[in-house]
A protein has these predicted regions:
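Glycine-rich, Trp-frequent "lid" loop and neighboring beta-strands that shape
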Residues: 117, 158-191
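Amphipathic, small/basic residue-rich leader segments at the start of a protein or domain
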Residues: 1-142, 154, 158, 162
Length: 191
């Protein structure tokens, strides 16, 4: 058992949370802290927001050190399988996803009205780095929640209400790239 915290043991990551521009970024993301009147988990000021980010990142770090990193080798050995036309994750991957879902770590940057945490993108990317350190493959799965930013930014209110709560609950998220002759041909992408 590793029993490490992949956030508290990384001063480089913690450094970015305290960047001087974060105060302006957070005030914008938090609409000058007006949501504190509507949501119990919304910060009242920058110090409150910073404390929220720090606590959530500490939880991410703890889960990654105590669960995800511990499962990484068995996840690589077992790998996913296709069963009856559906992907079945390795047992360790499923355990990782379950623990992350139980901790409420999906929808980190999505609005509170959809049960997201409404964090700026910087703490989300910090969390993504922590997850990647523990298991880069899991980061590819967990990080898909960032795709929901496109829905949040451009979808109708009806589409947002349909999909964003499900992303925040860890029920759904995918990035599908298909149609090499008519759309997204990833194999043909060149630098």
């Amino acid at each position: 058992n590793i029993m490490a915290n992949f956030y508290t043991d990384n001063e480089d990551i913690k450094f970015h949370l305290g960047h001087p521009l974060m105060e302006k970024i957070v005030a914008l993301k938090e609409r000058n802290y007006t949501e504190a009147q509507q949501y119990d988990n919304a910060p009242r000021d920058f110090e409150d927001a910073f404390d929220n980010y720090d606590k959530v990142l500490e939880i991410v770090g703890e889960i990654c050190g105590d669960v995800v990193a511990v499962n990484a080798e068995s996840v690589d050995a077992e790998g996913p399988q296709v069963v009856d036309g559906h992907v079945k994750y390795a047992a360790g991957t499923q355990q990782n996803i379950d623990v992350i879902n139980q901790a409420g770590l999906n929808g980190i940057s999505l609005p509170r009205k959809y049960n997201g945490l409404n964090f700026p993108i910087t703490p989300f990317i910090m969390a993504a780095e922590i997850v990647a350190r523990a298991d880069a493959g899991l980061q590819n799965i967990w990080g898909l929640q960032d795709c929901a930013e496109t829905i949040n930014e451009f979808a109708s209110d009806e589409q947002k209400a349909k999909y964003l709560p499900r992303v925040c609950a860890g029920e759904t998220c995918a990035m599908d790239l298909t149609e090499p002759d008519a759309g997204s041909d990833l194999q043909a992408v060149q630098l």
